[in-house]
């Protein structure tokens, strides 16, 4: 039995972020729809050919998306919320963009769908909305069209389809409550129709993604897989595909399904290969996810070979990426500025395709020379002085319980802070960033390229900070921010100023829609050589009598939004970052900054997928935050910000952070999230986001007032703040001014009516 390889998906955005640029040009009215579609076709053709040239045997088709693949599935099924529908009932690409962004070049603007994280990654999807009695029909043929494209190019392909049970699991009920699982029988005919169309095209294998199978599912959801796959069997071979964790807990259910193969993540899961082999039907294909699709590190192929070699000849075997390569940058070869030694430690998506080819060849031939040579730099890294810092390791070992405790309880601190700041009821603020204009980005780029000296750069940034302060004063905000003109990204900026991180030139990965991020890479022990944010915070504070927040990104978020080391635990990395940022808090405080925000939007997304593993993670995640913050004096107010969160199942840990103020993203969920804080009787102050910054739509004063009144039904007014959902970096100034003016007016109206 010859072993072949495949990938579960490939990055969509293009090496130079061509997709992002085409999308934004189309949205701005500077490109036609056909020009946008042409960019998509060109990228798909390029990426299939690149994977093929790198040695991939079976290419994924259907992994491309114009916004996100869950939203693509919603359109496939005809699941379009009423507010986003075209008047004639048709579905087009603007329908998709209205769901994702709230507006598109055609059609009426409407509130965008809710967005949340894809499992425990930094990728996002638009949450499907379900209503009672909903009907589904095949309405969007993107998958079939792309299969036709790939077949016309002569490729050997494997269509990729998000499975029906996971799709329903990822959605939310709107309107009258009901069990969304009851919709399963309604969507299965559409899946049957799609599989029949694929069979007509001569497709042999379909990758049907059911990552919900790695979760500890409620019994009814686990039981739903059997009737679902009974209905889908027979037309093509189905590769049931899981990732991000192991499947051993649900293996009995999986092994009974009428599918022909199973893909397992052998990087992030703890599944034993021998147990998988023994418990799966003998005629099933096993796809072994051996190459990590979520990082940038070169794989130790000798280790991967040893992990799987005993199955060679015993069953049909494929080798694969652990998950879609969507989560990895595209091509290491264009990184011309990386130090040669460090570069030898990495592999991006195309290099991971090459690793799959090397591993396939070694398993088929038994010759391990090539994989041994490939793995040599990994051995060298384990002993590199770039990786280990004795001082950091010594400080980490000396941490005591007292280091993560504030000097006084919240009640005492709150009184000291009220005396210091004397803020009104319904105090208004923003989350941190202001619009990153073309001028600001150009300034940073010129400085980075050496076209601008440090003095002129600092003068330019200072002017933008001054403008941000003036704008906020004019709007009447109560607590100001400096606007973060000097920051390209909330994680990248800190990584650039901390030892132990390195950066790529083109290591972009998709976050959602057209938004891409370039995560730093943690290559060694983390420390802070000098103050990072103090000078700009101090300058901003000198421009106003109102308090200006110091702005830090928290240790767990920096960890979650970076590519972490694989040779130490995530806990170790988080606590190293926390110690570095603890020093920053002390320096900000010494510089006269009285309010310091430590953003932890990623705290919840870092949760292990299996609930049984949550407690250990939350314990060290909370400890890292407290270690970062606890150095602050009583009258220094510590804020934190979180987004895309469902808090009800981690409220103990949210409270344990002991932040004086937490700001959260609530507008898309219509303040639903506050129910968790009310039920828990959350003791500290809360700023529920009152408008969605991911949409360019400007909320009315009445809309914001209504949301704040809802909030006041759940949280005492004296503990409520007024703020947007998130930072305003991606918005333009006109809509930002208009939205904030309405927000401030809403707060004033409520003060007057109290």
UniProtKB/Swiss-Prot annotation:
Pathway named in the protein's UniProt entry: Amino-acid biosynthesis; L-methionine biosynthesis via de novo pathway; L-methionine from L-homocysteine (MetE route): step 1/1
Superkingdom per UniProt: Bacteria
Binding site for 5-methyltetrahydropteroyltri-L-glutamate: 17-20, 117, 515-516, 561, 605
One Gene Ontology biological process: methionine biosynthetic process
Catalysed reactions, as listed in the record: 5-methyltetrahydropteroyltri-L-glutamate + L-homocysteine = tetrahydropteroyltri-L-glutamate + L-methionine
The record's free-text note on cofactor binding: Binds 1 zinc ion per subunit.
Residues bound to L-methionine: 431-433, 484, 599
Single GO term (MF): 5-methyltetrahydropteroyltriglutamate-homocysteine S-methyltransferase activity
Record-given protein name: 5-methyltetrahydropteroyltriglutamate--homocysteine methyltransferase
Lineage: Bacteria, Pseudomonadati, Pseudomonadota, Gammaproteobacteria, Enterobacterales
Gene name per UniProt: metE
């Amino acid at each position: 039995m010859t072993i072949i390889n495949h990938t579960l998906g490939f990055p969509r955005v293009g090496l130079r972020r061509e997709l992002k640029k085409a999308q934004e040009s189309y949205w701005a009215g500077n490109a036609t729809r056909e020009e946008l579609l042409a960019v998509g076709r060109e990228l798909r053709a390029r990426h299939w050919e690149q994977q093929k040239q790198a040695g991939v045997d079976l290419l994924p088709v259907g992994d491309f998306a114009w916004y996100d693949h869950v939203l693509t599935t919603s359109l496939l099924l005809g699941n379009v919320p009423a507010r986003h529908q075209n008047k004639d009932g048709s579905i087009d690409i603007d329908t998709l963009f209205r769901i994702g962004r709230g507006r598109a070049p055609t059609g009426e603007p409407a509130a965008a769908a809710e967005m949340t994280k894809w499992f425990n990654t930094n990728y996002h999807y638009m949450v499907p909305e379900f209503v009672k009695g909903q009907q589904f029909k095949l309405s969007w043929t993107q998958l079939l069209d792309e299969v036709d494209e790939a077949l016309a190019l002569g490729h050997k392909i494997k269509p990729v389809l998000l499975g029906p049970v996971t799709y329903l699991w990822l959605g939310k009920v709107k309107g009258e409550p009901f069990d969304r699982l009851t919709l399963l029988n309604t969507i299965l005919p559409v899946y049957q129709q799609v599989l029949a169309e694929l069979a007509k095209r001569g497709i042999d294998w379909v990758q049907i993604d059911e990552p919900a199978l790695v979760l500890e599912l409620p019994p009814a959801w686990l039981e739903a897989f059997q009737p679902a796959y009974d209905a889908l069997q027979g037309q093509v071979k189905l590769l049931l595909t899981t990732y991000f964790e192991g499947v051993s807990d649900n293996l009995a259910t999986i092994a009974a399904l009428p599918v022909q193969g199973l893909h397992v993540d052998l990087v992030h899961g703890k599944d034993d290969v021998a147990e998988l082999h023994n418990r799966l039907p003998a005629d099933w294909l096993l796809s072994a996810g051996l190459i990590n699709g979520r990082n940038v590190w070169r794989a130790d192929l000798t280790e991967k070979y040893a992990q799987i070699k005993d199955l060679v000849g015993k069953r049909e075997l494929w080798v694969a990426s652990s998950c879609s390569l969507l989560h990895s940058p595209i091509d290491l070869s264009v990184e011309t500025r990386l130090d040669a030694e460090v570069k030898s430690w990495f592999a991006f998506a195309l290099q991971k395709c090459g690793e799959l080819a090397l591993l396939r060849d070694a398993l088929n031939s038994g010759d391990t020379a090539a994989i041994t040579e490939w793995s040599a730099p990994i051995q060298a890294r384990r002993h590199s002085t770039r990786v280990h810092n004795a001082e950091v390791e010594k400080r980490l070992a000396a941490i005591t319980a007292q280091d993560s405790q504030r000097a006084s309880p919240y009640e005492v601190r709150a009184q000291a802070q009220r005396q210091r700041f004397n803020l009104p009821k319904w105090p208004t603020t923003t989350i941190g960033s202001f619009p990153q204009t073309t001028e600001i980005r150009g300034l940073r780029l010129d400085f980075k390229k050496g076209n601008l000296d440090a003095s002129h750069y600092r003068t330019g940034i200072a002017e933008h900070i001054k403008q941000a302060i003036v704008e906020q004063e004019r709007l009447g905000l109560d607590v100001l921010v400096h606007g973060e003109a000097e920051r390209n990204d909330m994680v990248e900026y800190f990584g650039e100023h901390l030892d132990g991180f390195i950066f790529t030139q083109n290591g972009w990965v998709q976050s959602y829609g057209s938004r891409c991020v370039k995560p730093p890479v943690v290559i060694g022990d983390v420390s802070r050589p000098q103050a990072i944010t103090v000078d700009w915070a101090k300058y901003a504070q000198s421009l106003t009598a109102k308090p200006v927040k110091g702005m830090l990104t928290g240790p767990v978020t920096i960890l979650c939004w970076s590519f972490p080391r694989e040779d130490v635990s995530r806990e170790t990395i988080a606590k190293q970052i926390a110690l570095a940022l603890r020093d920053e808090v002390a320096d900000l405080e010494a510089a006269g900054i009285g309010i310091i925000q430590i953003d932890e939007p990623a705290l919840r997304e870092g949760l292990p997928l299996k609930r049984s593993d949550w407690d250990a993670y939350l314990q060290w995640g909370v400890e890292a935050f407290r270690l970062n913050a606890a150095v602050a004096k009583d009258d220094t107010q510590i804020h934190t910000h979180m987004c895309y969160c469902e808090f009800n199942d981690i409220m103990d840990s949210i409270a344990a952070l002991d932040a004086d103020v937490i700001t959260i993203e609530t507008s898309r969920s219509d303040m639903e999230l506050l129910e968790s804080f009310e039920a828990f009787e959350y003791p500290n102050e809360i700023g529920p986001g009152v408008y969605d910054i991911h949409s360019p739509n400007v909320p009315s004063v009445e809309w914001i007032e209504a949301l704040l009144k809802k909030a006041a039904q759940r949280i005492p007014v004296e503990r409520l703040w007024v703020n947007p959902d998130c930072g305003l970096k991606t918005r333009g100034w006109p809509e930002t001014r208009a939205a904030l003016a309405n927000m401030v007016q809403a707060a004033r109206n409520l003060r007057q009516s109290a």
